[in-house]
Every structure is written in C-alpha cells, then in structure tokens.
C-alpha cells in the first residue's frame, strides 16, 4: 500500500505487542509501516524481533542521560530522522516528559493493561483483583501529559476469574493487547491521512461507548 503512515515504536522489553504490529504491517492493506524501533534497554528482546523483520533499530540508553528531557530529545531526534508521523509505546517503561508529549501532539499512542479510566499507573492487575471487579482488560489511548488520561481509541475486555492471580490475569489481558493494538493503529493511521484528530480527555462514558470485547 502506498502512502503508508510511518510509525516509530518505543520498547523496553520482550516486544510481544511490537511483534503483533510487525505481523499486521506485513499485510499490503495495512496503512502503516514501522520506520524505526527504539529501545532504552540494550538487552530488550524486542530489538531482535525488529532486526528479524529488517526494521531499523536504535538503542538510546536512558542511564547515559542526567536529565530526562535530554533523553527525550535524543529519542525525538531519531524519530524525526526516520520521518515518523506517529509513535507507538509498546512496553516502553519510561514516563515521557511534558515537553516530548507537547512536541508530538495527538501523535503518540499507548496500550495500558486496564479498562481506563479505571486502574491507572502500575500493578493494575492487582488493583483489579483487590477491587473484586468482574471485568478487566486493556486500553489503547492517546498520550497526553497526564498519566493514562488521554482519549481512548479502543478497549478489549476479559473476565476476572475467582482463581486469578495478577500473573494469570496479566497473561490473559496480554493476549487481547496483541489483538487490539494493531487494530487501533490501523484506525488511527487511516484517520491521520489528511484528517485532524481532536483531543478529548477520557471519562467513563467514553470507555463504555468504545468498549470492544475480543474475549
């Protein structure tokens, strides 16, 4: 497909969501191509996944930077060099600075392992189990300066079972992440091909209206 949106993917670890996007992007009809994969972790297995797919990679070790803003500037520079139009966070374990987010307005998407706006931050599977909810899931959303609060793109739900541990629930949610992230990327890539995207902070009604159950 011509005129594909160029996407930069930021990772820190295994890269299962990266692999899902790689697989989807190999289809001719997919509206996005991965221009570069950047990791702050030199040992991230996701780098091998990208290399195996002939995708350019770059390691930018955050430990080499005294200031978070300097690290973010280095990442942004590589994304600009690769002509990226959209950024996907796929297991990227760094909080981006407000300056970085503002430099890429409505051009950064993330996947979070809960049904936002519920259970923000870390250890969300434990939060869900402790709250005794019956449904958990994952959310693809735009990144804004406020953590886990950007406009929702899509969600997938899974049941929380009585015998669930944080690990078992996390594994089941991850399967849905692998399904929903490429779908959300496809949607956004099509939308930004000459069409503006309006920012809007999430609320409960947004989450309910855009719930996609893939379980």
Residue ranges and their predicted role:
Residues 35, 85, 106:
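Conserved acidic residues
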């Amino acid at each position: 497909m011509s005129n594909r949106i160029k996407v930069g993917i930021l990772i820190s670890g295994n890269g299962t969501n990266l692999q899902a996007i790689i697989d989807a992007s190999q289809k001719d009809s997919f509206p996005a191509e991965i221009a570069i994969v950047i990791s702050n972790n030199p040992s991230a297995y996701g780098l091998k996944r990208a290399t195996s797919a002939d995708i350019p990679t770059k390691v930018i070790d955050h430990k080499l930077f005294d200031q978070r803003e300097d690290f973010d500037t280095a990442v942004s520079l590589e994304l600009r060099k690769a002509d990226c139009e959209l950024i996907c966070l796929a297991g990227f374990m760094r909080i981006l600075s407000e300056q970085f987010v503002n430099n890429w307005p409505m051009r950064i998407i993330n996947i979070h392992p809960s049904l936002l706006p519920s259970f923000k931050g870390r250890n969300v599977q434990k939060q869900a189990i402790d709250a005794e909810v019956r449904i958990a899931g994952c959310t693809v959303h735009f990144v804004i300066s406020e953590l886990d609060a950007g406009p929702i793109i899509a969600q997938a739900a899974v049941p929380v079972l009585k015998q669930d541990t944080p690990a078992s629930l996390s594994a089941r949610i991850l399967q849905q992440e692998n399904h929903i992230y490429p779908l959300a990327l496809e949607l956004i890539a099509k939308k930004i091909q000459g069409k503006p995207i309006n920012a809007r902070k999430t609320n409960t009604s947004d989450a309910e209206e855009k719930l996609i159950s893939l379980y």
